[in-house]
Structure formats: C-alpha cells, structure tokens
C-alpha cells in the first residue's frame, strides 16, 4: 500500500520517503538527506504517537535549519493501524486522510520561536499538607524562596489525622512531624498559616499573589499555649479535626501537637463576636494574649510560579441514599480518628452511638467510586490499602472482633501492598467478600448490611455493630 502513499504525496507536490523505523538512526539520516537534497522547509512524519518521538523529529528538522514547529507527526499507528488491524482497506483510507489533513495543517503553521521571559525566582505553594510541604522543601532545597500558604492554623493536612501508615503501621503523626519541623525551620520557607489566597494576577514568570492572613484574636508572641483559654471557654462546636466525632471550643488549636502550636478564636462561633457578652478567655489568660481587636491582614507576594497542592475531600456519605445516615456508619477518615491515640476516644475503638466496643465491623469499598451512572466514575486508588490497614488495626485493638470487607477488586498497587493485604487475611482473619452492598439500615442495636458475594453467587446479610465506608476521593 506504500505506492498509494507515494501517489498521494506526488499529488500534493511533496517529497515522499519510506523507512520501516523512521525514529532509528538510518531513518533520521534519511530525513536529513531529504531536507538537504530537496531544500525542504517542512516535514510530516507518518508514524507513531507524537508523545514518543515528536521531539526527536523536531530536533532533526531544527539541525537542518527548519523551524521545529514546521515538523508535524501524522499518527497513523495509534489512530489507525492498531485500532483497525482487521480492516486494512478502511485503515489505509483513514491513514491517507490523516496524512492529507496533517500536510494541510502544516502548510498553515507559523514559524514559532520560544520566548525567554524574566523569572521571579520565588514560588508560592498553596496547601500545607504533605504534598505542599514536600513541594516547598524540594524547591527551597534548590535555593529558591518559598511562600507556603495553609488555610488551617497548623500544617499537616489530612496526613496528621491518620492513625498509622500503610505497610509499617507506624504512627502517622510521628512520621510526618520531622517534615513539619523542617518546613517551619527552613530559612527559605515562609509559612502563612491560617491564611487564604484572595487573588492571583500576572503572567508566566511574574505573578502577584494577594494573601489574607486571618485574624487569630490571639497574640502569638504573648501566648505560651497553656490552654487555659480553651479549658474555660463556654462555647463548644463540632471538631473539624476529629470529623465531628467530638467537640472543640470556640478558642482552640487543631490538635495538641499542632505546628505551629497556635491558638485561634473561631469568630463564626465565638459568643463575643456574635452579640453576646463573653470575655472569659480574655479574663483567664495569664499573659494578656487575647486580642479581640485584631483584623485580617492583606499582603502581596511576588512569585514566578505557583504550586497548587490543596489536597482532597471525601465524597459525602449522605449522597448514598441506600445507606442510612446513622451515627455508627462512618467514613474512612472518621474511623482513622477512632483508631488514632490522639483521637476522640484515645485510640479505643468505640461506637459513636453508645460507646460500646464493636464486635463486628463491615468495611465497604468503592462507595461513590467506579459508579459513573450515579456518582464518580473513577477508582480513588488509595481505598484498598487504607481499608486493609484499618481492618488490621481494628483486629489488633479488638482481637475477638470480626472484620468483613466488601470489595469489587483489590487494587494493591505498590511494593509490598499485595503481601500486606494477604497478611491481614492470614494473620488477622479478615474476611473479604467480593460484591457490592445494596443497603445499610438500622435494625435495633445492630446495623443490617445487605450485600452479595459474587464468587459464591449468594446474597449476604450481616448484622454489624459498625460500618466503615471507603468514600470516593
């Protein structure tokens, strides 16, 4: 069929050359000779994906004096020969069309020259979780100034909420603590905690980032984190850090080992800022650190690049109508807080409804994930491994308990992950059931879980004490 390609190229007035592996050294030499002998000013390579060898062919063209953007690839492999391998005639017609359109596009291409613009050698990293902190450290260790912006009073993101690490089961907070302190103490990293990005202006290489430092109403220079204000504060609200499993005060710090170890007053819930006469925290503070007159501060920083590392949120479990919105139906992050020694129960596994030890716990994976018709179409990737970790930690905390795990597929990605899951089955007695859960509802003191085991083709009903949902990320 290559004669038809020759006919096409001759009809368009272009030079035609054929080589079985054009990306090879002989193929590249053939391109060089064709350019030199025929005084070409543009090249179309009819072969594979641009992601593989576009730079290769453009480099050859540039070396022969052709503008790199006058070199195009007509992808007749992935777009044509592979998907239509069983229809050679139709594939040939499609290949001819792809080549024709690529040639016509190339005739209209303009010669481009990459621009070099001055770069402000500073970077703003938005998000103080583990990804944002790692990015900040990598950039700072390369010698550049970094502004790390975190909306919460302390650094760490979701990582400091976790109980343990997958595979090692080491304490998550202890594992991440050295990184947090390295960020805080790095001379090239300036941390804007309890701050938010208001606006970004500018262009590539030069951005102006407007930041809002929210008023903490606590003078950090005077406060020694004694915690007396928090202890005496009369206003309690659900704790965001503990996923609403317990309460915090209107004046609070995220968690006892928070870095920065800074107290803030939540003006949305503080009685004093909502029309009531209350100054208890100010009255009991021995250092006079409470300052109700503080205002938000707007600042601008000039940077050449931004890194957005704003983390994730879990798909709300309330969106799953088939699963009852019950106190003992938790999402994965809530269960992490129950497992954590710094959590609302001090690491003791207790049902939120009555504080009893759950003897049967059902873990449901892919809740809201891999469901394109109703929820999210994608796999959240991390759920299989953190569910295995949670189930193992549950069994070690409650040896007489039983953990059931409903799954679709076990995607144990990463070195040692498959063995970790197998260890849970063999050593801790985790029971994996392949199938979806159709309904969860309260049945007296128990939670009825209706599902199916597709391997045995049987309907399953489990009366559990607690259900943990691996929600889509």
Identify the residue ranges that each predicted region occupies:
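Single conserved hydrophobic/aromatic residue that forms the stacking wall/gate
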Residues: 1-16
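N-terminal glycine-rich dinucleotide-binding loop that anchors FAD/FMN and/or NAD(P) in oxidoreductases
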Residues: 14, 33, 59-75, 89-97, ...
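Metallocofactor- and cofactor-centric catalytic cores in central/energy metabolism, strongly enriched
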Residues: 14-37, 54, 63, 76
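Rossmann-like dinucleotide/flavin-binding elements
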Residues: 24-26, 35-38, 81-86, 91-156, ...
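Short, well-ordered coil/turn residues at beta-beta hairpins
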Residues: 46-47, 309-310, 364, 464, ...
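Core beta-strand elements of the Rossmann-like FAD/NAD(P) dinucleotide-binding domain
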Residues: 219, 298-305, 457-466
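C-terminal catalytic lobe of FAD-dependent flavoproteins
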Residues: 419-473
């Amino acid at each position: 069929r290559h004669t038809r390609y020759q006919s096409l190229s001759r009809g368009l007035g272009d030079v035609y050359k054929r080589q079985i592996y054009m990306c090879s050294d002989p193929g590249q030499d053939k391109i060089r000779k064709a350019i030199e002998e025929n005084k070409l000013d543009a090249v179309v390579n009819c072969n594979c994906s641009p992601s593989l060898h576009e730079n290769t062919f453009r480099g050859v063209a540039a070396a022969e004096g052709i503008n790199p953007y006058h070199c195009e690839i007509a992808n007749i492999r992935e777009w044509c020969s592979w998907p239509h391998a069983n229809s050679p005639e139709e594939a040939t017609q499609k290949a001819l069309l792809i080549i024709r359109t690529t040639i016509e596009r190339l005739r209209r291409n303009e010669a481009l020259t990459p621009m070099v613009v001055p770069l402000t050698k500073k970077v703003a990293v938005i998000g103080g979780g583990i990804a944002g902190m790692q990015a900040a450290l990598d950039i700072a260790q390369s010698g550049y100034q970094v502004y790390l912006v975190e909306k919460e009073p302390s650094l760490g993101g979701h990582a400091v909420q976790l109980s343990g690490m997958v595979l090692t089961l080491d304490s998550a907070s202890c594992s991440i603590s050295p990184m947090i302190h390295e960020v805080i103490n790095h001379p090239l990293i300036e941390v804007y905690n309890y701050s938010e990005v208001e606006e970004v202006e500018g262009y590539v290489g030069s951005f102006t980032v407007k930041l809002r430092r929210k008023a903490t109403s606590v003078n950090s220079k005077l406060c020694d984190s004694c915690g007396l204000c928090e202890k005496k504060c009369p206003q309690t609200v659900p704790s965001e850090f503990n996923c609403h499993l317990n309460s915090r005060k209107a004046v609070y710090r995220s968690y006892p080992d928070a870095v920065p170890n800074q107290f803030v007053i939540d003006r949305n819930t503080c009685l004093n800022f909502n029309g009531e006469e209350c100054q208890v925290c100010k009255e009991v503070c021995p250092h006079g650190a409470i300052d109700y007159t503080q205002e938000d501060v707007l600042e601008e920083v000039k940077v050449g690049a931004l890194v957005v590392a704003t983390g994730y949120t879990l798909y709300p479990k309330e969106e799953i109508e088939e699963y009852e919105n019950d106190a003992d139906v938790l999402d994965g992050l809530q269960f992490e807080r129950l497992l954590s020694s710094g959590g609302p129960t001090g690491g003791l596994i207790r049902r939120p409804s009555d504080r009893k030890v759950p003897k049967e716990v059902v873990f449901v994976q892919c809740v809201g994930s891999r469901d394109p018709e109703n929820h999210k179409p994608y796999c959240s990737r991390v759920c299989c491994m953190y569910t295995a970790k949670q189930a193992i930690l549950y069994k070690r905390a409650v040896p007489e308990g039983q953990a059931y795990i409903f799954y679709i597929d076990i995607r144990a990605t990463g070195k040692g992950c498959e063995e970790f899951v197998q260890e849970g089955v063999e050593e801790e007695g985790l029971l994996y059931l392949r199938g979806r859960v159709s309904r969860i509802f309260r049945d007296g003191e128990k939670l009825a879980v209706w599902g199916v085991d597709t391997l045995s083709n049987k309907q399953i009903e489990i009366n559990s004490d607690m259900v943990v949902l691996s929600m889509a990320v």
